[in-house]
Amino acid sequence: MKMRRYKLFLMFCMAGLCLISFLHFFKTLSYVTFPRELASLSPNLVSSFFWNNAPVTPQASPEPGGPDLLRTPLYSHSPLLQPLPPSKAAEELHRVDLVLPEDTTEYFVRTKAGGVCFKPGTKMLERPPPGRPEEKPEGANGSSARRPPRYLLSARERTGGRGARRKWVECVCLPGWHGPSCGVPTVVQYSNLPTKERLVPREVPRRVINAINVNHEFDLLDVRFHELGDVVDAFVVCESNFTAYGEPRPLKFREMLTNGTFEYIRHKVLYVFLDHFPPGGRQDGWIADDYLRTFLTQDGVSRLRNLRPDDVFIIDDADEIPARDGVLFLKLYDGWTEPFAFHMRKSLYGFFWKQPGTLEVVSGCTVDMLQAVYGLDGIRLRRRQYYTMPNFRQYENRTGHILVQWSLGSPLHFAGWHCSWCFTPEGIYFKLVSAQNGDFPRWGDYEDKRDLNYIRGLIRTGGWFDGTQQEYPPADPSEHMYAPKYLLKNYDRFHYLLDNPYQEPRSTAAGGWRHRGPEGRPPARGKLDEAEV
């Protein structure tokens, strides 16, 4: 009898352990890449059975005339927010691999005098110096033969230990470039990089991978593509059919890829599709926020072919745009340490509201470090100190590199732009209702904060949703690093980001756009309230 009770007790214990193990196994399985095909059948079918995924706030009623709790009718009944039908999702862009090509661009030139000069940063010799006779044409028919451009060099003498004089050659740098080869930009020259004296040009350029999650920041994405398109070798862009809050959204970026909107950069874009929402993401928004970057990194890197360990990986938010010169330096030089960050100019609602300080977020390292130290997890790169990771010592011993975190730029020398909430009022509205449920207070839950007239008032004054009024003055459009060059050259399209559309035009004495010359003149400013695009 006792033996029978003992066996019955053991059976109940084993059944309980099996049930607990199954629950933990399923929860762990949902975070791995390979079961996403299974999860795509219904992202919340099984998870809603074990975990309560009910939203903290009531959902809007989809029926006409029903109560719209915490949502306005523009959002609740908009057909743009319904998932795409299967017929439009037939093209499997998210399964296509991208082969990284070799960069064959000749960035440096070797002179006869022994100098190695960075072409864009070195002053060219257009005329022979005084005292040198003009070169005679060597063409057979009297036409001058084409010769490669000449670069100015400066020769110096250094006294050796035994009194012998040694000559070496340096390039003559253009403003904004530094170093013996004129390839070190100002954002590196004035950074806290501890190994500046060890910087040397590479024989073969690295490839640069830029990873981004996108929701509806398509104008800023277009600016990124134009700003970095010639130095970045692969843009890994992740899009989900869920917002960060867990509600359905259309695959707008995939549509823009297929209809030719981004045809000029299509060959460099690797499309990543996140077709499920992580369990627990509705209750804790940071789970969803972190998982987006984890999935982006793991799925994206796994589909890059011809990848080398010393290639550069940079992960950004959609509103963070690194400066081209800094990214090009990482591509062309050896001797810098890792991981690295960018000091970015901070703006709110548009580049016209410049916030004090800089945004400094660790966002890049080599592919080797990403795999060995961070375990191919982009959120660890952005939020975890490398010395807290268990494998960083093994990585140092294997590579012989001492890991020292540094930042491109400084508080006085911006190495990029961070434009927060930089949308039209309608775009800010969509950001409010799409925001994850973890960064409290969640302003999208308040009906008055979603009012478009209220949002226009925030853009006009630079205020915040909590009612505070900032004291910083509007930025001067003539300042260096005011905005990316592509924006400045296309004022008519991006004027809502460059000039406050709800303020009176600045006078010429205030240094407004009339001082910018042909690069960015404003159009007629008759109706300020109709300035959205």
Swiss-Prot record:
Keywords: Glycoprotein, Glycosyltransferase, Golgi apparatus, Membrane, Signal-anchor, Transferase, Transmembrane, Transmembrane helix. GO terms for molecular function: beta-1,4-mannosylglycoprotein 4-beta-N-acetylglucosaminyltransferase activity; glycosyltransferase activity. Signal peptide: none annotated. Its EC number is 2.4.1.144. Pathway: Protein modification; protein glycosylation. It comes from the Eukaryota. The keyword Amino-acid biosynthesis does not apply. It is a single-pass type II membrane protein. Interacts with MGAT4D. This is Beta-1,4-mannosyl-glycoprotein 4-beta-N-acetylglucosaminyltransferase. It comes from Homo sapiens.
